[in-house]
């Protein structure tokens, strides 16, 4: 069928560890610093809303975290007067300076120490 595909081989990946990470006692300043240092580069677009952190959005869909409205930007009601606010949001700014999921997340590559090696296949 001549279907093109890529094999994505990785030597390791990170575990966000949402069931074992507990930053619930951290103050607002420390949570903002954690979010800032995380450098998680993606946002999610779902149901007409942009989410500050795609992992927080995934966790909400999976039932591991609550969905928090002020961590999103609603594009369904967007008008040009909100252009600056949208640009700031896309650059990683939100009202709190972090997302609630940070309290359960070990962070992205720059700060995450939970490195996971892939399993090796044994020959038959």
Where are these regions (language model features)?
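Extracellular/mature segments of secreted proteins
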Residues: 45-47, 110-116
């Amino acid at each position: 069928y001549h279907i093109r595909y890529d094999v994505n081989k990785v030597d390791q990946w990170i575990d966000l560890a949402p069931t074992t990470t507990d930053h619930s006692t951290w103050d607002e300043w420390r949570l903002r610093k954690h979010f800032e240092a995380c450098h998680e580069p993606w946002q999610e677009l779902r149901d007409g809303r942009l989410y500050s952190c795609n992992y927080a959005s995934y966790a909400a869909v999976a039932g591991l975290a609550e969905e928090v409205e002020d961590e999103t930007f609603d594009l369904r009601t967007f008008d040009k007067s909100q252009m600056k606010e949208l640009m700031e949001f896309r650059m990683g700014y939100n009202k709190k300076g972090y997302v609630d999921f940070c309290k359960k997340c070990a962070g992205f590559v720059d700060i995450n120490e939970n490195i996971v090696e892939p399993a090796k296949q044994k020959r038959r």
